[in-house]
Amino acid sequence: VRTVATSRNFTQGTHQETKNNLDVAINGNGFFEVNMPDGTIGYTRDGSFQVDAQGRLVTSSGLPVANGITIPQGTTSVNISADGAVSAIVAGNTQPQPLGNLAMSSFINSAGLEPVGQNLYKESAASGQPQQGTPGTNGLGYIRQGFLEASNVNVVEELVTMIQTQRAYEMNSKAIQTSDQMLAKLSQL
C-alpha cells in the first residue's frame, strides 16, 4: 500500500481573534502574495505578519509581502482595512499615512498550487494563472484585522474516517485471505 496523492483543502477555517494589528485573516477566497527569495511570487493564507529590522511587512518566515509595504519608524498604530489598504499613524501625527495595499490573488484551481513549505505555494500549470485583485472584489474575500485563520480540519471527523477506512481494509484483507484458503482447498481435491 502506498500513497498515490494528497490533496489540499483551502476551504476557510474559523477565525480566531488575536488583537494583534499585524494579524489578518482572509474571510473568503484568495491568497496573500509574498516575494520569494528567487524573485517569484508565492501565495499564502497565513496572515500572521510582522515588521522586520528594515521596517518591511513580512510573513512569519521573514518573506516580504508583495507591493513592498514599509512601516515607518515611530509608528504608533497600523490599520489594515477590509479592502487591504494599509495605513499607519506615526508619532506626532493625527492623520493616518497610507502605506500601500496588500496584494491578493485567486486561482481557478487552488488545489493545483504547488506547495513549497511554510504555508507557501507557487502557481503551477494545474492551478492556472493567478487572478489578482482587491480584497472584497471579483470573488476575493475581504480582510479581517486582528484575526488569524485556524485550521479547517475537524480532527474528530478525520479520525472517524480513518478508523472506517482501516476497518474496510481489514475486511477486504480477510475476504481475500478466505478466498485464497478456499482456492487452496479446492486445488487439493
For the regions a protein language model found, what residue spans apply to each?
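Amphipathic alpha-helical polymerization modules
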Residues: 1-189
